[in-house]
C-alpha cells in the first residue's frame, strides 16, 4: 500500500507487498524488495537498493550524499541494504563517494534510532548499531558486531566479527574479532558472552581466549599474531580468523586497558 501523500516516482522499482507511509519521499530509480516497509516521512534517495523484508523508520534517510567536501553530487553511487535489516527512526546511511561504488549494510542488521553509517562503509550481517553511534567513511565491520550507544568510529578503521563495544567510547584503531572494546582505543578481553550466545563451540572459545592472551602478552600485537599464524597455532575457524585479522599491513590496533591489568 502506498499512502496518497507519499512521493513515489514511476522509475522506482518496488517489490510485492511494499508499504509506503504518509509523506515518505522516494527518489528516481530506488529499489525496494518484497515485503518491506517505508514509514511516514522517511526519505529514500537516489542510489538506494533496499532488500526484502526491510524497514525504514520515520525521518530516516537512506542514500544521502556523502559528508565529503570534495564530493560531486552528480556522481552516481549507491547504498545496498541486505534482506531483513531495520533502519530505525532518524538513522542515516550515506552513499559511496566514487562513481559506481556502494556503501553496504548486510542482512538482518538493526540500525537503531539516530545511528549513522558514513560513505563507503561495509557492514556485515546481524550487526547492531545502538542510538547515536556513528561510523566514519570507509569503516569495515564484520558480522555479529554490537556497537553501543554514542560510540564514534574513525574513518577507515576495521571492526572484527563478534565485537562488543561499550557505550560512549571512541576508536581510531582496528578492533580485532571477538573482543570487548571500551573507552578510547582499548581492549578489555574476549566477548565471551557474545560468543556463547552465538553457540560458538567451547573449543573455539577457549582457543580464541588463549590466542588473545598470547597476542596481547607484550610487544607488538601484530608481530605476535604473525608468528602464531606462521606456526599455525590454531585449530578452529575462529582462532584463524582472530589471527588473520592482524595480517593486513600498515594497520594499528587497539591496546590493552592498563587499568584492567591492575
Predicted regions and their residues:
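Structural signal for interior beta-strand "rungs" in well-ordered beta-sheet cores
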Residues: 1-186
Amino acid at each position: 500500500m502506498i499512502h496518497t501523500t507519499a512521493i513515489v516516482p514511476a522509475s522506482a522499482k518496488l517489490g510485492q507487498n511494499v508499504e509506503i507511509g504518509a509523506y515518505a519521499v522516494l527518489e528516481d530509480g530506488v529499489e525496494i524488495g518484497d515485503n518491506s516497509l517505508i514509514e511516514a516521512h522517511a526519505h529514500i534517495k537516489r542510489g538506494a537498493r533496499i532488500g526484502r523484508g526491510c524497514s525504514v523508520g520515520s525521518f530516516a534517510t537512506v542514500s544521502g550524499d556523502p559528508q565529503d567536501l570534495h564530493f560531486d553530487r552528480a556522481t552516481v553511487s549507491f547504498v545496498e541494504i541486505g534482506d531483513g535489516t531495520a533502519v530505525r527512526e532518524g538513522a542515516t546511511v550515506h552513499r559511496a563517494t566514487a562513481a559506481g561504488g556502494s556503501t553496504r549494510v548486510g542482512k538482518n542488521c538493526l540500525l537503531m534510532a539516530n545511528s549513522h553509517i558514513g560513505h563507503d562503509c561495509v557492514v556485515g550481517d546481524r550487526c547492531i548499531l545502538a542510538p547515536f553511534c556513528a561510523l566514519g567513511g570507509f569503516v569495515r565491520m564484520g558480522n555479529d558486531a554490537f556497537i553501543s550507544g554514542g560510540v564514534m568510529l574513525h574513518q577507515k578503521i576495521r571492526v572484527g566479527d563478534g565485537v562488543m563495544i561499550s557505550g560512549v567510547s571512541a576508536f581510531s584503531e582496528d578492533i580485532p574479532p571477538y573482543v570487548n572494546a571500551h573507552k578510547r582505543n582499548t581492549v578489555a578481553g574476549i566477548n565471551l558472552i557474545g560468543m556463547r550466545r552465538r553457540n560458538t563451540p567451547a573449543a573455539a572459545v577457549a582457543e580464541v581466549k588463549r590466542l588473545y592472551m598470547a597476542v596481547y602478552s607484550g610487544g607488538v600485537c601484530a608481530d605476535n599474531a604473525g608468528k602464531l599464524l606462521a606456526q599455525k597455532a590454531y585449530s578452529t575457524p575462529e582462532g584463524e580468523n582472530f589471527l588473520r585479522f592482524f595480517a593486513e599491513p600498515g594497520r594499528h590496533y587497539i591496546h590493552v586497558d592498563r587499568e584492567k591489568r591492575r
